[in-house]
Amino acid sequence: YFSLMPIIIGIFAVLAGSGLLASDEENGRLDLIAAQPISRSGLFVGRVLAFLTAMALILLAAWFLGLVVPATLFDFPATWLEMLRPFASLFAFLFLFGGLALLLGMILPSRRMAASLAGGLLILSYFVTGLGEIVEDMAVAADFSPYTYFQSGDAMAGLNWTWVAGLLAVGAVFVLLAWWRFLRRDIRVAGEGGWSLRLRRRQPAA
């Protein structure tokens, strides 16, 4: 039940994270929203809180429909709270990649590019962790893979809160960097950005 859930819901988290601000910017709405009597920080925090709320509701629905309901129909040894533990780990995992997608959306020229890169890293993390379990040479690389620290059904017996805190901390760093970047970047009127750099013009010789 939990093996592919980080990938399936993770794709949604990446798409949502990359589009929290970049989507409205490319559609020409963000400059109109920013013109309202609300600070950039307030807009940013509101979008992030909405994203986290949506993710929490999705995971609660998956917990209730996927585990709680079947547990009431069949004899399942775990309690409802124990069945909720893997979703706490999954929330931290999704927060990390959602924050990464948000940061990339503030750096890269387009939301599509940000979502593609974050999604690629998500899938790469899955394969690196899997290979690290069977290929000895990949074990070191797997230590740097976020998927390694996702706790699936084993978390019902006990959750490693250090791993959860680590995923949340890395995700928080990504979100803070995205906030810092959003405060200092120019908002495009519409369309995708580019890679062009503004160079200082050489002053004519006297």
Model regions and ranges:
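Helix-loop-helix units of permease transmembrane domains in multi-pass membrane transporters
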Residues: L21-L52
